[in-house]
Amino acid sequence: MGGTGVIDHFLEVFTRYIDGGFGLLSGEVTFIATTLIVIDVVLAALFWSWGADDDVIARLVKKTLFVGVFAYLIGNWNNLARIVFESYAGLGLKASGTSFSVADLLRPGKVAQTGLDAGRPLLESISDLMGWVSVFENFIQIACLLFAWALILLAFFILAVQLFVTLIEFKLTTLAGFVLIPFGLFGKSAFMAERVLGNVISSGIKVLVLAVIIGIGSTLFSEFTAGFGGATPTIDDAMAIVLAALSLLGLGIFGPGIANGLVSGGPQLGAGAAIGTGLAAGGMVMALSLIHISEPTRQAE
């Protein structure tokens, strides 16, 4: 549970309790489904008995198939939701061409660890520039490299948190949908089940988008840091990494909104997203600076 694995432990605990909720709620869901089936079939039988010219056999077959489909959905809801998740996650990872697997995507701590690994060459370069005299001679370069390292960590940590929230959202959506799916058996309450299915698909698209962003981002930053070839990166190299980290940070913050745009039919990313990313990054860096300034003051007191 140490290091970046703490977020994996949180996800494991949440997942275990949410998956246990399906077993705890199965009795109530079965009761709701049975009640709605009885109401629907009784009403249908009354209407069929009044309509002498209707084809009762055809209507009975249609009603049986309809009830059977919903019974299958209710009985296998958790497994079907898992298949949807793995399908969308697999598509996103395949599109990005990364070495990440679906199992790795279920570990947000691995995403955070990827950021630590991507920023480690910068820290090693900073340590090579440190010295009693060289620290003052290379102060600007050290500051730029440290700033680039902080932004890389920030970008990947935000991606890890976004992935954690998305996974929990998907689990909670499927659990809440498990309770609402039986209402699709009755015509007057069918809209509740329709929204559940739409929400599950929307959450799956969000997983796909995050999988693409994480896969491409991890590949790009491994190429960035490997491109130094053991040499100390210059200020231009550091600023290039800052630009890349800001781009990944913007995608991590606003990228999941693409899923909402696909469902609603409107674009979600634009200049406002870029400005918001810059302001968010600036605010976080300023907060870190204030913390570093306040620490010597507290020690002096």
Residue ranges: model-predicted function:
Residues 73-172, 203, 212-271:
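Non-cytosolic segments of integral membrane proteins
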Residues 291-301:
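Single conserved hydrophobic/aromatic residue that forms the stacking wall/gate
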Residues 275-290:
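Cytosolic juxtamembrane regulatory segments of multi-pass membrane proteins
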Residues 3-16, 82-99, 145-156, 181-199:
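Hydrophobic alpha-helical transmembrane segments
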Residues 54-69, 194-203:
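Alpha-helical transmembrane segments and their helix-start/interface "positive-inside/aromatic belt" motifs
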Residues 1-38, 42, 46, 52-55, ...:
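Binding/recognition "hotspot" determinant
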Residues 169-191, 260:
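Juxtamembrane interface at the ends
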